[in-house]
Swiss-Prot record:
This is Phosphoribosyl-AMP cyclohydrolase. The gene is hisI. Pathway: Amino-acid biosynthesis; L-histidine biosynthesis; L-histidine from 5-phospho-alpha-D-ribose 1-diphosphate: step 3/9. Its EC number is 3.5.4.19. Keywords: Amino-acid biosynthesis, Cytoplasm, Histidine biosynthesis, Hydrolase, Magnesium, Metal-binding, Zinc. GO terms for biological process: L-histidine biosynthetic process. PANTHER family: HISTIDINE BIOSYNTHESIS BIFUNCTIONAL PROTEIN, HISTIDINE BIOSYNTHESIS BIFUNCTIONAL PROTEIN HIS7. Mg(2+) binds at D84, D86, D88. It comes from Halobacterium salinarum (strain ATCC 700922 / JCM 11081 / NRC-1). Its main location: cytoplasm.
Amino acid sequence: MEEFDVDLDFGGAGHTDDGDGLVAVIAQDADSRDVLMLAYATREAVARTATTGRAHYYSRSRDELWEKGATSGNTQSVDEIRVDCDGDALLYLVAQTGGACHTGHESCFHRTLDGDTVGDQVFDPDDAY
């Protein structure tokens, strides 16, 4: 099992169907500092990210590990991984290729609470998935 130099609270964000713990991961553009997405990761996903430099997450809906952009081509190259003060959330500082959101938007945070769209759609999801 992968060991890290800091204590991480896997399980703070729930568990997989197999009982593996999850941590919340925020992906942020390393240059613009725009918040791109929130996802979850298992210990294995974090280890793969640290080893490969490519963002890996855990899909709770599909119950599987996934590499960002493996299907769509909208990849995240991870420049740095930061840990929050409680060790139960991570921040991936990334170089984003294409949009981060499966809806085709640059960021998953492309709507206001009033329902207004505030972000650009940078690709057609029908062409990517």
